[in-house]
Amino acid sequence: MTQYFRSLAFFLLPVPATAMACDGWPSWARGACQRVDQIWNEGGNDLYLTGYSWHNRAMYSSDKIRSFNELAWGGGLGKSIYDEDGDWQGLYAMAFLDSHSDIEPIAGYGFQKIGRIGADTRLGIGYTVFLTSRSDIMSRVPFPGILPLVSAGYRDATLYATYIPGGKGNGNVLFMFGRWEF
């Protein structure tokens, strides 16, 4: 459990530092810095709940499927905004049980183009860029990633899904989680 808290602290400690002034940043990175600063300082608070990961049955043996944990329980916190174009942008930090029932911390940035279906309903498509750590990949050394991200939302609740690609016997996982704006 101590390892879990160390991993989570690794991801959470840099987050408040993003609220610094962006003037000293190179011009090519200043826009990203300013957006992160805006999300951190002006964004609403989010509660994330994880709960399901589906392993593609065509890529694993039935014995291997039975060994996997597909109830990826966990949660986290984040901050997000709907920008001047109506698109969603957010920062998040979560921890959940991975396929081997080990705790996986993750922290990152998400972006989605949002299509509105009425006043309260929306669909989104975009991506997430993140840093994570897994016991079965590089012995918990944090590593970056980028994944597609789709969503369906109603009022303050949004359901997200991403697909982790892979080969025969690894990856190929549909991961679903939710976000509640408060």
From Swiss-Prot:
The record's active-site residues are H55, D98, S99
Leader sequence range is 1-21
GO BP, one annotated term: lipid A biosynthetic process
What InterPro entries would the database entry show?
LipidA_acyl_PagP, OMP/PagP_b-brl
What are the protein's GO molecular function terms? O-palmitoyltransferase activity
What catalytic reaction does the record list?
a lipid A + a 1,2-diacyl-sn-glycero-3-phosphocholine = a hepta-acyl lipid A + a 2-acyl-sn-glycero-3-phosphocholine; a lipid IVA + a 1,2-diacyl-sn-glycero-3-phosphocholine = a lipid IVB + a 2-acyl-sn-glycero-3-phosphocholine; a lipid IIA + a 1,2-diacyl-sn-glycero-3-phosphocholine = a lipid IIB + a 2-acyl-sn-glycero-3-phosphocholine
Per the record, the similarity remark reads: Belongs to the lipid A palmitoyltransferase family.
| PROSITE patterns linked to this entry | PROKAR_LIPOPROTEIN
What membrane topology is given? Lipid-anchor
Gene source species: Bordetella pertussis (strain Tohama I / ATCC BAA-589 / NCTC 13251)
Q: Where is this site: Role in lipopolysaccharide recognition?
A: K64
Annotated protein name in UniProt: Lipid A acyltransferase PagP
Gene that encodes the chain: pagP
Chief subcellular location equals membrane
